[in-house]
């Protein structure tokens, strides 16, 4: 019997993880909690209790709760509970019986075997349970923490529209599966993940300003990550004379000194975010080619004019 429950649990875990996981953000802690602030600890006796509920004949009460670790306080928001049948149907799926987003719900179910799944951001836990004739209380341990991300150039915060973050499980030096678990995370969003090591990839603009960093997430803590980019916003212009009007219908290529193409665009004055360094701008207009070498300094936004002569 235990062997059957074990394999059913494995099958449900595989079935739940087969779908596409998208980033979910949640306010994990109250405002003001920093990465260095531990969540206060309370004994299990302090876990909130449910008010008395009338249980109809043929039903049993299942009381649920979750916490970050043993003896930690209960999680009070952001949870999604699902109760499934313990056996798969003919199609191989586990039938969903009940779903609840309360932090500590009480579900009324007929006696029998079930599988309970709780999700909190990208963290989750699952247990097989058996309901008899008496109320059953189950507390799930979810060793999860939060990531809150932002990007800066010097002391200036990068606008949300110009930066995004991807989160990968494990270190950047590992060679395992490199699919992101959260994509295009915005500044200030809180991403809830299981505790562990993660690789953060920050993209400022769409060219070559990319910063990678490994961080450690601890259960019950919010980790604020500030990614500093050494880059600047450059506006390209093809002009007939210095300070003149930019010529329309110009095709642009930005190259490294070694000739690698960093960015291509078309327009009179395209904006491009470039990492600090030296570059060559090539402008093509009406069948003619013009070029100029230039240098990017961190935080110094400005125009790069290429003379059409």
Label for each model-derived stretch:
Residues 7-17:
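Bacterial N-terminal signal peptides
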Residues 17-23:
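Sec/Tat signal peptide C-region and signal peptidase I cleavage site
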Residues 24-48, 100-101, 120-143, 205-228, ...:
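Structured interaction patches on ligand/partner-binding surfaces of diverse proteins
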Residues 60-73, 147-155, 233-242:
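A short, amphipathic beta-strand motif
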Residues 62, 78-84, 114-116, 142, ...:
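Short, structured motif recognition centered on aromatic/hydrophobic residues
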Residues 70-89, 155-175, 241-260:
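Short, ordered, surface-exposed loop/turn motifs in non-cytosolic proteins
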Residues 86-103, 172-187, 256-268:
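Short, acidic Ser/Thr/Gly-rich low-complexity loop/linker segments typical of extracellular
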Residues 100-115, 120-122, 184-199, 204-207, ...:
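Short Pro-Gly-centered beta-turn/loop motif in secreted/extracellular proteins
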């Amino acid at each position: 019997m235990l062997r059957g429950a074990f394999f059913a649990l494995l099958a449900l875990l595989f079935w739940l993880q087969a779908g596409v996981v998208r980033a979910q953000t949640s306010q994990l802690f109250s405002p003001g909690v920093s990465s260095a602030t531990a969540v206060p600890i309370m004994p299990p006796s302090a876990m909130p209790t449910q008010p008395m509920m009338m249980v109809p004949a043929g039903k049993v009460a299942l009381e649920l709760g979750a916490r970050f670790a043993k003896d930690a306080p209960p999680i009070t928001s952001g949870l999604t509970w699902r109760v499934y049948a313990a056996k798969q149907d003919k199609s191989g799926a586990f039938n969903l019986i009940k779903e609840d987003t309360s932090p500590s719900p009480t579900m009324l179910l007929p006696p029998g075997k079930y599988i309970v799944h709780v999700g909190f951001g990208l963290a989750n836990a699952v247990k097989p349970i058996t309901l008899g004739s008496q109320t059953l209380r189950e507390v799930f341990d979810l060793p999860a923490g939060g990531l809150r991300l932002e990007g800066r150039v010097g002391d200036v915060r990068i606008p949300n529209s110009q930066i995004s973050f991807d989160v990968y499980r494990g270190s950047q030096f590992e060679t395992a599966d490199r699919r992101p678990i959260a994509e295009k995370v915005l500044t200030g969003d809180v991403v809830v993940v299981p505790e562990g090591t993660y690789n953060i990839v920050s993209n400022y603009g769409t060219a070559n300003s990319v910063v990678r960093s490994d961080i450690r997430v601890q259960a019950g803590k919010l980790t604020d990550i500030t990614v500093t980019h050494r880059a600047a916003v450059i506006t390209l212009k093809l002009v007939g004379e210095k300070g003149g009007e930019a010529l329309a219908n110009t095709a642009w290529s930005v190259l490294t000194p070694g000739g690698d193409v960093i960015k291509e665009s078309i327009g009179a004055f395209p904006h491009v975010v470039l990492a600090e360094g030296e570059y060559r701008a090539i402008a093509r207009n009406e069948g003619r080619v013009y070029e100029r070498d230039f240098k990017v300094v961190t935080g110094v936004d400005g125009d790069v004019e290429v003379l059409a002569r």
